[in-house]
């Protein structure tokens, strides 16, 4: 299982998103658990980003909610860390 690292920008966007849509909080936390267990689980629709966001990845929470993240080497060894960068609608994060 990979370790999730919540970047400050992700933490802020998560709070804003769940304040606007409280029902999303549990769904997002479930997706984060799945992401830590298997980032390429088909239900997440994980994909590489291109252009200005090259080097980052995104996964699907629901129709108009995406999580943007990066794989970083774990200084302690083992599986890569997943650094959570942003969460929001398609137009907000891309």
What are these regions (language model features)?
Residues 1-31:
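Arg/Lys-rich, positively charged N-terminal/basic patches that mediate binding to nucleic acids
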Residues 31, 45, 55, 63-65, ...:
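A generic structural signal for short beta-strands and their flanking turns/coil linkers
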Residues 34-58:
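A short, surface-exposed loop/turn module that caps and links secondary-structure elements
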Residues 17, 35, 71-72:
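Hydrophobic helix-cap positions at the C-terminus of alpha-helices
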Residues 3, 22-25, 60-94:
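Enriched for short, Lys/Arg-rich terminal
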Residues 16-20, 38, 59:
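Histidine kinase transmitter module recognition
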Residues 11, 15, 54, 89-92:
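A broad detector of the eukaryotic-type serine/threonine protein kinase catalytic domain
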């Amino acid at each position: 299982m990979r370790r999730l690292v919540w970047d400050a920008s992700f933490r802020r966007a998560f709070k804003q998103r769940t304040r606007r849509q409280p029902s999303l909080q549990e769904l997002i936390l479930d997706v984060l658990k799945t992401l830590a267990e298997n980032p390429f689980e088909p239900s997440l629709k994980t994909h590489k980003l291109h252009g200005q966001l090259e080097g980052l990845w995104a996964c699907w929470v629901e129709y108009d909610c995406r999580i943007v993240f990066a794989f970083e080497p774990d200084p302690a060894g083992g599986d890569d860390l997943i650094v959570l960068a942003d969460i929001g609608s398609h137009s907000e994060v891309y």
